[in-house]
Regions:
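Bacterial Sec-dependent N-terminal signal peptides
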Residues: 1-26
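Extracytoplasmic cell-surface/polysaccharide-interacting catalytic and binding patches
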Residues: 17-95, 102-179
């Protein structure tokens, strides 16, 4: 089962490599709402609410939904279908991310006195280093619409499988080549 989980996550990560590089960041043509391609997908769009590393709704998030390129959503559907056969499914935290959201992340990292979410999201690091350490990027692959943040859930219990850390945890446990 662990082998399958790593395979699924590898396939999803590779979606970003096949994203069209010339697609305009704000142009949504060719984008779809993920749940329209995968009706059984579960959402927990953290940046639409306050349960995220900023502690507030992130700029640019106007609804609790996820957008991806049509190709990425169709590839994700294949993964969802395979997982469903095992009694598992996908829970999407984020897909397309507008640049204004990334800009919000940058502003947050510079407000060093704001440590509201430190205990939950970055207890061991200085928030000013989240970019330097590779937890967040100033030019996110999410802005192309072919990158997705997700986890796997048990369909019966609706509980997330243990991936080592929670969503958006900035620490050694959540990155394989942590400096």
């Amino acid at each position: 089962m662990k082998r399958h989980l790593f395979l699924y996550l590898f396939v999803l990560a590779s979606l970003a490599c096949h994203a069209p590089k010339d697609q305009a960041y704000q142009d949504k043509s060719g984008f779809v709402q993920v749940h329209k391609v995968i009706p059984s997908i579960a959402y927990d769009i953290r940046y639409y609410g306050n349960d995220n590393f900023l502690g507030v709704r992130v700029d640019g998030y106007k609804a609790p939904t996820a957008y991806l390129t049509k190709e990425a959503a169709e590839a994700l559907k294949k993964v969802q279908d395979e997982l469903n056969e095992e009694g598992l499914g996908l829970l999407v935290f984020d897909g397309y991310r507008p640049q204004k959201a990334v800009d919000h992340f940058v502003r947050w990292s510079k407000a060093v006195s704001d440590t509201l979410t430190k205990a939950k999201y970055y207890p061991e690091i200085d928030k000013a280093k989240v970019f330097e350490l590779g937890f967040v990027a100033t030019k996110s692959s999410h802005t192309r619409g072919s990158t997705v943040d997700l986890t796997i859930i048990n369909l019966e219990t609706k509980k997330e499988l243990d991936m080592g850390s929670g969503f958006d945890f900035f620490g050694a446990i959540s990155i394989h080549d942590f400096p």
